A protein has these predicted regions:
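Divalent metal-coordination and catalytic microenvironments
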Residues: 3, 21, 29-30, 53, ...
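Metallo-beta-lactamase
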Residues: 85-143, 241-255
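Active-site metal-binding motif and surrounding structural segment of the metallo-beta-lactamase
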Residues: 35-82, 177-178
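Conserved beta-strand hairpin/beta-sheet module of binuclear metal-dependent hydrolase folds
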Residues: 1-42, 144-162
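Active-site metal-binding loops of divalent metal-dependent hydrolases
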Residues: 8-9, 26, 31-33, 54, ...
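Catalytic core of the metallo-beta-lactamase
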Residues: 117-175
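Structural motif
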Residues: 27, 48, 130, 153-155, ...
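Cap/insert and terminal regions of metallo-dependent hydrolase folds
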Residues: 164-254
Length: 256
């Protein structure tokens, strides 16, 4: 499985885009502003999107994506997956005919271009060549991370979170983990803000990574614009025993 980073920043500005990852050309993990880095032809290949939570930096691209590839979706609806809370938020606050048209009814209810699907944590789901699982994490709105496993390897994504046991305990129940994408939004001087907004800083992340029995390659994402150098320098001090580096936009990771 090819894992392409479309956006991984904690904000926008210049060439920075928010969270969106492309898996094997057809699947998105979150749909932030990074989706705009795809060509229209690439967008038309997308068949499914898995969401971690309902915050705008992770969903902002979805309404415009559906509109842009509307003609393509008339032959096969775009499948959107997420927790019950995330799906409800999208239906209630975005596709409500006020912020954006309800594409689950367009062109007709029986032949709509958009379909919402609720997933349950702890269940394994097959998506093309890989299996995936939603894992609850600790953020200010209901949020899940994901673990993907293909024939040749495995990857986990923490989504937005702070100190928790659920994510790390579940990963430890598996025999292996090759890659870990984990957020670290703020520097250590903002530790109280991290606790309030439920994000990681290097100190909190280092403490949680120590719970993990595996030694995956670690990629740091969701850094606040302008603070990247400080956060990564602090990560070098706080995270011991892991090969750790900053995730880059347009980076491709081969999990197979």
């Amino acid at each position: 499985m090819k894992f392409r980073v479309l956006g991984c920043s904690g904000g926008i500005g210049g060439d920075l885009s928010t969270t969106s990852f492309l898996l094997d050309d057809h699947i998105l993990l979150d749909c932030g502003t990074g989706i705009s880095n795809l060509t229209l032809a690439e967008m038309k290949q997308i068949r499914a999107i898995y969401f971690t939570h309902s915050h705008l930096d992770h969903i902002a691209g979805l309404p415009l994506l559906v509109d842009s590839i509307f003609d393509t979706l008339q032959s096969e609806a775009l499948q959107v997956y997420g927790s019950k809370e995330t799906i409800t938020a999208l239906q209630t606050h975005i596709f409500n005919n006020i912020i954006w048209p309800d594409f689950t009814l367009i062109p007709t209810k029986d032949n709509a271009v958009l379909s919402f699907n609720i997933l349950e944590p702890g269940q394994l789901y097959q998506q093309q060549t890989c299996k995936l699982e939603m894992i609850p994490v600790n953020h200010v709105v209901p949020t899940v991370g994901y673990r993907f496993e293909c024939a040749g390897g495995s990857m986990a994504f923490s989504a937005d979170t702070t100190t928790n046991d659920s994510f790390w305990d579940r990963l430890n129940q598996y025999d292996s983990l090759d890659y870990l994408l984990v957020e670290c939004a703020f520097s250590n001087k903002e530790i109280e803000l991290c606790r309030l907004a439920r994000h990681y800083c290097p100190e909190l992340l280092g403490a949680d990574l120590a719970k993990l029995k595996h030694k995956p390659k670690v990629y740091i994402s969701h850094l606040k614009p302008g603070s990247e150098a400080v956060i990564m320098a602090e990560c070098e001090q706080a995270i011991k025993g892991f090969d750790c580096q900053k995730l880059q936009s347009d980076q491709v990771i081969d999990i197979s």
